[in-house]
Amino acid sequence: MNNDNTDYVSNESGTLSRLFKLPQHGTTVRTELIAGMTTFLTMVYIVFVNPQILGAAQMDPKVVFVTTCLIAGIGSIAMGIFANLPVALAPAMGLNAFFAFVVVGAMGISWQTGMGAIFWGAVGLFLLTLFRIRYWMISNIPLSLRIGITSGIGLFIALMGLKNTGVIVANKDTLVMIGDLSSHGVLLGILGFFIITVLSSRHFHAAVLVSIVVTSCCGLFFGDVHFSGVYSIPPDISGVIGEVDLSGALTLELAGIIFSFMLINLFDSSGTLIGVTDKAGLIDGNGKFPNMNKALYVDSVSSVAGAFIGTSSVTAYIESTSGVAVGGRTGLTAVVVGVMFLLVMFFSPLVAIVPPYATAGALIFVGVLMTSSLARVNWDDFTESVPAFITTVMMPFTFSITEGIALGFMSYCIMKVCTGRWRDLNLCVVVVAALFALKIILVD
């Protein structure tokens, strides 16, 4: 009997080794399983944060919990099987806040129409991938603008986190002011942030998850939330699947929003794929990684599918580097992550015991990570640093990621032309800047 079990396990391991080419990548099934669990623990916070954010757009948090798990599970498994890369996918932080607080909240657009904008942005990304334009765009967008976009989104997310904790509140004279720091909600939000930063500085991979658990337990103690169980059959999601308003999103008013969703997702996912595969030692001398086109297809198709089932834009997660750090080198790592997300679907009642301040610390911490790239800007060259600065600060100050990107691209062209360095411009930058200028003239 024991011999039969041993043979079965050996055969299963052999199948996985052949399917994911483990020997060629110098890894084992055990290492890939550990790597998958590590990546999952570092990014599972998204199943709590995403429902909180999209809930602000009048979407049912429990349904969003399920769709988040579903798309993260299927997307990660697809990345593992088709591209054989240790990269996990899930709804993107930043774009979910943009959707909920700007597109739906500030602009007053229904979540169904907002999802339509995400859908068309994802379709655009797929077409760019199909016609091999995506890699050309990545290569031709200046580093300063890419950094400005990333950092601006980081500040935007941090602003949402500070607002959710109550650290900052509205003021009619000064726009914002410090909140009531004696409030237990504010104090717990601050506590959650420092739990993440301290644990992360000690290289603890599940820092964000621990912070959410600790502050949620405190929320139970103070009566801010109420325990309603742990396990349940996933709620019906038929009310959101296919509810995207595709025709309503195809308007001039939303053209800039659609373009922003596409552009941000293009930079975010492509940059993450390159970063993770580079850390895994999979990048060749030409800056490309194995199955690059397959990975880009999986990424863009996942975003289309995500909008269709009712969740925000899907992207590759930089947290995948945590799995790579412990030895993950193949798609088996991503498959393990995907399976874990699918299993988590059966724990939707847990969403109800996570108060807003419990996830706020994660938002602020993501802001810290994203703004750290500003150190790479050449601050001595004003034709590079000024557009990066404008892009970064105008996102939170205008409460619009789209406006930040638009002003960044246009200021880049202005600075280069007015300083006589117009030869630094390329077709991609000029076209994007011109499109945004036309949007401002014709629509705004």
Curated annotation (Swiss-Prot):
One of its GO terms (molecular function) is adenine transmembrane transporter activity. Keywords: Cell inner membrane, Cell membrane, Membrane, Transmembrane, Transmembrane helix, Transport. The keyword Heme does not apply. The chain crosses the membrane at residues 30-53, 64-82, 85-101, 114-133, 146-166, 183-200, 205-223, 252-280, 294-309, 312-327, 332-346, 358-377. Residues 1-29, 83-84, 134-145, 201-204, 281-293, 328-331, 378-382, 419-444 are cytoplasmic. GO terms for biological process: adenine transport. High-affinity transporter for adenine. Its main location: membrane. This is Adenine permease AdeQ. Belongs to the nucleobase:cation symporter-2 (NCS2) (TC 2.A.40) family. Azg-like subfamily. Residues 383-418 dip into the membrane without crossing it. One of its GO terms (cellular component) is plasma membrane. It comes from Escherichia coli (strain K12).
